Amino acid sequence: MSGYGDFLKGLLREPGAVSAPTPSSPALAAAIAAKVDPLQSGLVVELGAGTGVVTQALLDRGIAPERLIAVEYCAYFAGLLAQRFPGVTVVQGDAFAFERYLPAGSQIAAVVSGVPLLNFPLPRRRALITRALALQGPSGRFVQLSYGWRPPISSAFGIAPEKTIVWRNFPPAHIWTFTAQEQPVAQQAQAQRTAGWGRPAQALFRISPPTS
């Protein structure tokens, strides 16, 4: 089945678990993956991996499968991911609690998010981004896909994202890139205290492929 067909099937099976208007285009996926440095050591965490268009782009970018953790809320999409990317750790779970799926003491190179953050309250958006950045080194980044024309959190919070517009997608999309070095020290400390970092590695799991 095509990527769009898989997207529609997931939408019909679990309408409450799918928030994206359409699957990402290859051009958008490549632009997102280009924000991740494959030479930066550590895990790359993809939140809201969907049908795997961005997952494939990250692999094409040079991210080794064993370095990639894909978190997806929709059970059908998570099954597709497990089937298509056997070397990638696929987790069916909550992107806002992604830390619990990480091995204790893991180094994070980047977090890539396709979760529609503008659909969630501002405090949840801010907490997710600041926690994700706090878990990374100074070169870490949080890359957010959005179909809105405003960033998920404003520069008033002391974090000014870089903006990229991708026109070769329907609808046109924004990529907001937040870097760890921009985050105020006080926010980093608070995020580390509340992140739940260091959960057991057993929380990682691969799920079974979907049945037709």
Features from the language model and the residues they span:
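Class I SAM-dependent methyltransferase Rossmann-like catalytic core
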Residues: 3-38
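SAM/dcSAM-binding transferase cores
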Residues: 7-10, 155-212
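Conserved class I S-adenosyl-L-methionine
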Residues: 41-50
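Glycine-rich SAM-binding Motif I of class I
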Residues: 52-56
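Conserved SAM/SAH-binding beta-strand->alpha-helix loop
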Residues: 74
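Conserved SAM-binding loop
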Residues: 81-82
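A short glycine-rich, Lys/Arg-flanked "PGG" loop and its adjoining helix->strand segment in the class I
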Residues: 126-138
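Conserved beta-strand signature within the Rossmann-like core of class I S-adenosyl-L-methionine
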Residues: 136-147
